[in-house]
């Protein structure tokens, strides 16, 4: 997976991401309200990830639905009754990606999926389940966080119109603005870890096997 996300490889994706972004933006109405989340933010990351993997455009809605269903149940506080739906989505998405692996082995191309398959040839210890786990992680971690960052970032600018005006006057500030959005309105505010050995934090003794939630969102605002 790392070989597909080197700085050089990531830069090569820039044109494709810009093209996908511009295509979606061109479809938005210029003189009437539209749903930014539904018509842009929710579509863009799934399209980019699918393009990276070489997944058929006609399957985008289904892969997004699976990703959404799985993501809902792994939240720190998940609503009851979602587990069965999430488990079914996990099975269906896994089988879909397994079929994609078989298809790509029979008909290789030049995508991230092919890079992973080639990596498996170089390291036979990697099983198909390992590849599928990485593909699932890419979908789950990649599409939801990007969607939420786009939505949170736009909302922050609407709440601070003077900052939006600064960006309009000087687009060169955009890289710094994106970094600040990641801090100020991060789409990921919790990191989960399980202790492997006894640990002590202040007066608190934490035994092995304990699930911890690290609130990075709080650290970003230095409470």
Spans of features found by a protein language model:
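Cytochrome P450
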Residues: 2-223
